[in-house]
């Protein structure tokens, strides 16, 4: 299973650009900063990230109720948090509060140190699961950027920096798209379809996740089957299946849905939410951080006699400039934006926010291992789960409890 996402923030200049030498600063985190980052209560960061993820999901799903939804809240919030390093006063507050941080309980410094530490930890090489995340700044060769901003983005977020000539928009676009394509192993080949000549800076964040099921599906068992888009329409899809698998499961009668957890080798898991026929909107409207917590706390290892799930690859792209203001992030898109901690003057605002994501789900997995508690589970009535209608997926890093990706599959074909 692979999940790939990239987000680009495009900043345009209000005033004419001023010539600068373009030297890019570099620094590293001090031991003291590392300590502070680790001291940040991980639940505070995870709680805010979860709240933002579900709030954004509702906005995206509401705009296109019958369309697939795939996005990485972590990639989006990482880019916006980096942007907030360059923002001041109400512009900065809007960004961080829009990301669901309570600034009366957590300081800006703690947010950056905690977030930076989280992204560093996620990118540590691991044998069992591949998570690759990073950020890059593409700065116009004639745009003065404060060395303090460059140093902080490098020290806290390991953001790479490149000089671009936005007066040659096609060349600049190729530079950015080639970078993103390379970092996402070719899965996202074109993050930007066009750039404006007055672009001063582009901020990019990408996140690539590749996980192997702890209990894999056998490719020889995959067969063609119906996936019901609604009560009247269906499409043929390759359907994976596995029999007699023990995995965490809960039935939520109140919300009319079944919830199944499939674990990856390593420290990630996927929560699959299968609403009863016609109940997707009911489940979506009830989605809150408390709902996810209730499901996770209620999961119990159960024998699933017959589990069926479509094999698919879907991609989505969003312009978030219209969506983020609905979450309170408004000023940064206007000429009243104060991004003076980037340039020293109020000459920048955000003109585009582009997010693209790709989700691949297949049978791939390592050697199957029995789930904990198999011997203690009492078999009752046969339990079958058939994901042959719209469902949701939430992929979480278990160590930090951070949501990496959220998806709704309405049509896997």
Swiss-Prot record:
Keywords: Glycoprotein, Phosphoprotein, Protease inhibitor, Secreted, Serine protease inhibitor, Signal
Signal peptide: 1-28
Gene3D superfamilies: Alpha-1-antitrypsin, domain 1, Antithrombin, subunit I, domain 2
Cellular localisation: Secreted
Positions bearing carbohydrate: 102, 182, 220, 267
Alphabetical list of SUPFAM superfamilies matching this protein: Serpins
Tissue localization of expression: Liver.
PROSITE patterns, alphabetized: SERPIN
Induction per the UniProt record: By growth hormone. Reduced during acute inflammation.
A Gene Ontology term for the protein's cellular component: extracellular space
Location of Phosphoserine modifications: 30
Membrane spanning stretches: none
RCL, as annotated region: 365-389
Keyword Magnesium assigned: no
Family, as annotated: Belongs to the serpin family.
Record remark: domains: The reactive center loop (RCL) extends out from the body of the protein and directs binding to the target protease. The protease cleaves the serpin at the reactive site within the RCL, establishing a covalent linkage between the serpin reactive site and the protease. The resulting inactive serpin-protease complex is highly stable. Variability within the reactive center loop (RCL) sequences of Serpina3 paralogs may determine target protease specificity.
Protein name as annotated: Serine protease inhibitor A3L
Annotated source species: Rattus norvegicus
Name of the gene encoding the protein in the UniProt record: Serpina3l
